[in-house]
C-alpha cells in the first residue's frame, strides 16, 4: 500500500542512522541466525522419515510435485494412481500410533502404486518447491527438505526484522518465539506443509504491517516482496493458511486504518492481495473441509449439546501446540512442564499487552481471536465432529502467532508493554529448560520408545541415522551430540535476542535507560518515558490550597 501519514500512527524510518551496523550488532545478529538454524537442525535430526501427521500422503505428494519423472514418480494404471518408492508410503506406519515402538524400519527399493497423493486437495506450491529435493536417496532428500525450510524461514524473519522500523521489530520476533515450543520447532523442519503454514502467515502479517507503516523506500522494497512471497507460501501450503492470509490482511487494515489510506493505489493493493488469497483458498478441493467440514462427516445429526461440548473443549486446540497434544502422529506425549511453560509464556505476553491497546488494535486482535473460535467450530459443526477429531492444533498455531504479533504492535518506541529484567530472565530460563525436556522426549520416543526412558541417549537405542562406531569413538554423530547441540543453540539464541533487545525493541528493553541503538530506525537513545498516571485510575483529585480569609 502507498505510504501514508497519520496523526495517530507515527511510522519511524528504518534507516535514519548513517552510522550503519556496529560490530556488536553484526556479531550478535549472526549468532542469533546461526543458533536458530542449529536449533532447528537438531529438531530436523530428532525424528525419522515420515514423523509428522499424514506424512505418507505428503511425501508422495512431494515426490510427485513436478508430475511424472522416471525413477521418482511414475504414472499408474488407474486414474489418480502414481507409482513411487514403497518406503514413502509404508515407512511411517512401522512406528506411527505406537509410542512404545521405535523407528527401526527398513527402507526398500521396490516401487508400489498408490492413490494417496495430492490431486488438487491442497495447494501445489509447497509440494512443487519441495519436489526439487526428491531423489532416490530418501534420507538425504528428507534431511535436505527439513534444513531448507528451516533456513528459509529463519532468513525470512531476519530480513523482515531488519527492514521493519525499530518499534515494530518485536512483532515478528516475539510472535515467533511465543509459538515455538514445542510444535513450532517440531513442524518447521519437516516435510509437512504446516512447515510453511505456521510461520509464513506470521511473516506475512509482519511484512505487510511494516510495508503499510514505514516511510523508508529501501525498507518498503524489502518488505513488499517478502509480503508477496510469504502470502504465496502461506496460501500455497494449506487451504486453511490461505484463509488466514485473508484474516491477516483484514487485521492489518484495521490496525493501521486512517482516512488518508483510502486512495486508489491502496484499495488496488488490498484488493489484489485479497484476490490472491481467495484464489488459493477456493482453488483447493479441501476448502470445503476447511469451511464446511471433513469429507464423510461424523455424527448424522449435530445437536446443541455437541455444539456446547465443542465450545467448552475448544481451548484444548489452542493449548495443543504447546505440548498438551502429542508431537509426531500425535503419539509423542510431552511432559507437563513443556506445555505449562509454553502456554504460560504465551498468556503472559498477551495479557501484558492488553492494557496498551487502543481501539483499532483491540479490534484487530479481536478479529484474529474470533477466527481462532469460529474457524474450528465451523469445520467441526459442519462435519458433525467433536473437538479431538479432524481439526488439529497445528492448523491453528499460525493464528496464535498472528494473535501475539498483533498484540505486540505499538505506534512508537514510547508505547507498548515492557518487562523487567527479572521477568525476561525468568521467561528465558523456563523456555530453555522446557526446550531441553521437549527435545529429549521427542528423540527418546524414536530411539527407545516411550515405555523406556534412557539415562543416556547414546546407549540402548534401536534407531538412529547412523550406526554406533564399533571402536567406541568419543566423538561421533550421536543422539547426545544432537540433543546437547540443539539445547545449547536454543539457549544461545535467546541470549542473542537479549543482547539485541535495544535494537529489536523487545519488551525487556527499558526505554528509560541510556542504551543506544546502532541499527535501524533510531540510532540515538530514546527519550525518557513520562511517568504520568492514566486518568482512569485516578481515585482522588488533587486538593486545591484554600484561600486565606
Residue spans for each PLM region:
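Start-transfer (signal-anchor) and selected internal transmembrane alpha helices
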Residues: 1-42, 265-273, 423-428, 488-533, ...
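Interfacial juxtamembrane loops and adjacent helix segments
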Residues: 67-139
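Membrane-lumen/periplasm interface segments of multi-pass, membrane-embedded glycan/lipid transferases
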Residues: 129, 263-270, 278-356, 461-487, ...
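Transmembrane-helix motifs of polytopic, lipid-linked glycan transferases
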Residues: 132, 144-168
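Membrane-interface alpha helices of multi-pass inner-membrane proteins
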Residues: 186, 222-239, 244-250, 473
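Short acidic/glycine- and proline-prone juxtamembrane loop motifs at membrane-interface regions
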Residues: 190-197
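Perimembrane helix-loop-helix junctions
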Residues: 210-215, 221, 244-274
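Transmembrane helical bundles and short interhelical boundary loops of multi-pass, membrane-embedded
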Residues: 256, 277-278, 290-303, 421-521, ...
Amino acid at each position: 500500500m502507498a505510504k501514508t501519514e497519520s496523526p495517530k500512527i507515527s511510522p519511524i524510518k528504518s534507516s535514519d542512522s548513517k552510522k550503519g551496523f556496529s560490530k556488536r550488532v553484526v556479531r550478535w545478529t549472526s549468532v542469533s541466525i546461526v543458533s536458530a538454524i542449529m536449533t532447528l537442525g537438531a529438531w530436523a535430526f530428532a525424528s525419522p522419515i515420515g514423523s509428522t501427521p499424514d506424512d505418507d500422503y505428503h511425501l508422495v505428494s512431494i515426490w510427485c510435485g513436478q508430475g511424472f519423472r522416471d525413477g521418482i514418480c511414475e504414472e499408474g494404471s488407474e486414474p489418480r494412481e502414481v507409482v513411487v518408492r514403497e518406503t514413502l508410503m509404508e515407512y511411517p506406519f512401522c512406528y506411527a500410533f505406537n509410542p512404545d515402538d521405535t523407528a527401526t524400519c527398513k527402507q526398500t527399493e521396490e516401487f508400489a502404486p498408490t492413490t494417496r497423493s495430492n490431486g488438487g486437495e491442497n495447494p501445489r506450491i509447497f509440494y512443487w518447491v519441495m519436489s526439487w529435493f526428491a531423489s532416490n536417496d530418501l534420507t538425504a532428500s528428507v534431511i535436505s527438505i527439513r534444513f531448507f525450510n528451516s533456513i528459509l524461514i529463519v532468513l525470512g524473519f531476519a530480513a523482515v526484522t531488519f527492514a521493519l522500523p525499530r518499534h515494530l521489530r518485536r512483532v515478528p520476533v516475539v510472535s515467533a518465539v511465543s509459538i515455538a515450543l514445542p510444535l513450532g520447532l517440531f513442524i518447521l523442519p519437516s516435510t509437512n506443509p504446516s512447515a510453511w503454514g505456521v510461520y509464513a502467515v506470521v511473516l506475512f502479517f509482519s511484512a505487510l504491517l511494516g510495508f503499510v507503516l514505514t516511510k523508508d523506500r529501501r525498507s518498503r522494497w524489502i518488505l513488499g516482496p517478502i509480503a508477496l512471497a510469504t502470502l504465496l507460501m502461506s496460501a500455497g501450503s494449506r487451504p486453511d493458511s490461505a484463509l488466514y492470509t485473508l484474516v491477516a490482511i483484514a487485521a492489518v487494515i484495521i490496525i493501521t486504518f486512517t482516512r488518508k489510506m483510502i486512495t486508489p493505489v491502496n484499495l488496488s493493493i488490498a484488493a489484489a492481495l485479497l484476490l490472491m488469497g481467495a484464489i488459493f483458498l477456493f482453488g483447493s478441493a479441501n476448502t470445503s473441509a476447511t469451511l464446511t467440514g471433513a469429507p464423510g462427516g461424523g455424527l448424522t445429526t449435530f445437536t446443541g449439546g455437541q455444539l456446547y461440548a465443542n465450545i467448552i473443549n475448544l481451548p484444548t486446540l489452542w493449548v495443543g501446540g504447546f505440548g498438551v497434544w502429542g508431537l509426531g502422529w500425535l503419539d509423542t506425549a510431552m511432559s507437563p512442564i513443556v506445555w505449562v511453560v509454553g502456554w504460560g509464556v504465551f498468556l503472559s505476553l498477551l495479557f501484558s499487552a492488553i492494557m496498551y491497546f487502543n481501539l483499532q488494535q483491540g479490534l484487530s486482535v479481536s478479529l484474529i481471536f474470533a477466527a481462532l473460535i469460529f474457524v474450528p467450530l465451523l469445520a467441526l459443526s459442519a462435519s458433525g465432529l467433536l473437538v479431538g477429531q479432524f481439526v488439529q492444533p497445528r492448523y491453528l498455531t499460525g493464528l496464535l502467532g498472528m494473535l501475539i504479533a498483533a498484540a505486540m504492535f505499538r505506534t512508537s518506541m514510547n508505547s507498548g508493554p515492557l518487562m523487567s529484567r527479572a521477568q525476561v530472565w525468568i521467561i528465558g530460563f523456563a523456555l530453555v529448560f522446557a526446550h531441553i525436556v521437549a527435545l529429549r522426549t521427542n528423540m527418546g520416543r524414536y530411539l527407545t520408545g516411550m515405555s523406556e526412558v534412557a539415562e543416556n541417549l547414546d546407549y540402548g537405542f534401536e534407531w538412529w541415522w547412523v550406526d554406533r562406531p564399533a571402536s567406541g569413538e568419543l566423538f561421533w554423530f550421536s543422539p547426545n551430540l544432537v540433543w546437547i547441540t540443539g539445547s545449547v543453540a536454543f539457549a544461545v539464541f535467546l541470549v542473542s535476542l537479549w543482547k539485541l533487545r535495544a535494537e529489536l525493541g523487545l519488551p525487556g528493553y527499558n526505554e528509560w535507560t541510556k542504551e543506544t541503538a546502532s541499527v535501524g530506525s533510531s540510532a540515538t537513545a530514546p527519550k525518557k518515558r513520562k511517568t504520568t498516571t492514566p486518568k482512569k485510575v485516578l481515585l482522588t483529585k488533587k486538593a486545591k490550597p484554600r484561600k486565606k480569609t
